[in-house]
Amino acid sequence: MPQVRQRIDSERLVREGVLMAVLRAACLFLVLAAAACGPTEPLNVVAIQTGKSLNTDHSVGNHATSFRPKDTMYVSVLSNGRGAGTITVKWSFGGQVVHEATKKVSYNDQAATDFRFQAADDFPIGDYAIEVIVDGKSLETRRVKVE
C-alpha cells in the first residue's frame, strides 16, 4: 500500500508541475501580448504646426500661414509621451471640405505625425481652414491664406 500511495503522490506532483508550467506559459503570453498591443492611453497632442516643408522627424520645417497657389500645405501634429489614437486633418475652402486625411498612430515617446495637401492644379486664392481632430474630437482649427 505505501508503494501505491507513493506512486499516486508522484503522479499528483507531475500533474501539478505540468499545470504550473502551463500557467506560467499562459501568464508570459498575456504579458507579451499586452506589451505588443502598444499604448492604450489617449494621444497627448502638444502642438499643431502648419508650413511649407517638413523636417526629417516629420515636424514642420518652414512654418507658414500664407501659401502660394502651387505650394504644398503641410500640417504636423506633435504628441508627447505614450499614447495612441486616430488623427484626422480636414482642409476647407469656402465652407466645403476639399481634402481630408486620417492616420491611426501609436507612440511611446515624442512624435510628429505629418499630413500634406497639394492641389491637383493651383490652390484657389483665398482663406482656408485646417481642422485637426483626434479620436473624433476637434482639437483646433487653423486659418491659412493662399495669396
Feature-to-residue mapping (PLM):
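Conserved aromatic beta-strand anchor motif in extracellular beta-sandwich/beta-rich domains
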Residues: V89-F93, V132
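Short edge beta-strand/loop segments characteristic of extracellular beta-sandwich folds
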Residues: T72-N80
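Short, exposed beta-strand-loop hairpins at the edges of beta-sheets
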Residues: A119-V146
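Short, compositionally biased P/S/T/A/G/V-rich stretches that sit at domain boundaries
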Residues: G38-P69
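C-terminal motif of bacterial Sec signal peptides marking the signal peptidase cleavage site
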Residues: A33-A36
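Solvent-exposed serine/threonine-rich low-complexity stretches and specific carbohydrate-binding patches
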Residues: V98-N108
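Bacterial N-terminal signal peptides that target proteins for export
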Residues: R5-C27
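Aromatic sugar-binding surface patches on proteins
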Residues: N108-F117
